[in-house]
Amino acid sequence: MNLKYDFSGWATRNDLVCADGRTIRHNAFEDCDGKTVPLVWNHQHDEPGNILGHALLENRKDGVYAYCTFNETDAGKAAKMLVQHGDIASLSIYANGLKQTPSKDVTHGVIREVSLVVAGANPGAFIDFVDMAHGEGGEQEMILSAYEPISLFRPDEKPPLVHKAGSGDGKKEDKPKDDGK
């Protein structure tokens, strides 16, 4: 896929119980594959000022993935900074036309918007890629996953050193930090 977007992540994941007790099932939103929906702040889709950009949806085996682009409004720019800084890492969807079983398994629906939220209802809905473009003409990329430690250093530098556990002498051990991989 060759398209420009500011970040991407899971709009919703299958087979996880959401905060409302519903469980999205495989291909529940397959009709939304390839559709573009508004990207909004915290499901507040009743005012134009809450529209932060748009999300291109991709139905996958594990759920619906979203490629999101911010608009140039003040709200869009502010939200972009929140995402780039890792202050917001969760996504959520608003959908209607739901078909569900008596046990609250969602088997069909239509996604109407993707929201940036402080805490999502679906535990698997989060941002996992942020395009950190710098104005110097070069693209910088990173993958951010919620609740994982981040270590940053330049490619021409050695990774930061860590203090040896229990040494107490404050000397650094000549061993790079574990970057969580």
Predicted regions and their residues:
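Short conserved beta-strand and strand-loop elements enriched in small hydrophobics
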Residues: K35-D46, L91
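C-terminal (or distal) subdomains of carbohydrate-active enzymes
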Residues: E47-I51
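Residue microenvironments linked to proteolytic maturation
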Residues: K4-G9, N14-D20, P38, H54-P155
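Short Gly/aromatic-enriched secondary-structure transition segments
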Residues: D20-C32
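Short, surface-exposed beta-strand-loop junctions and turns on beta-sheet-rich folds
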Residues: I24-R25, D46, E72-D74
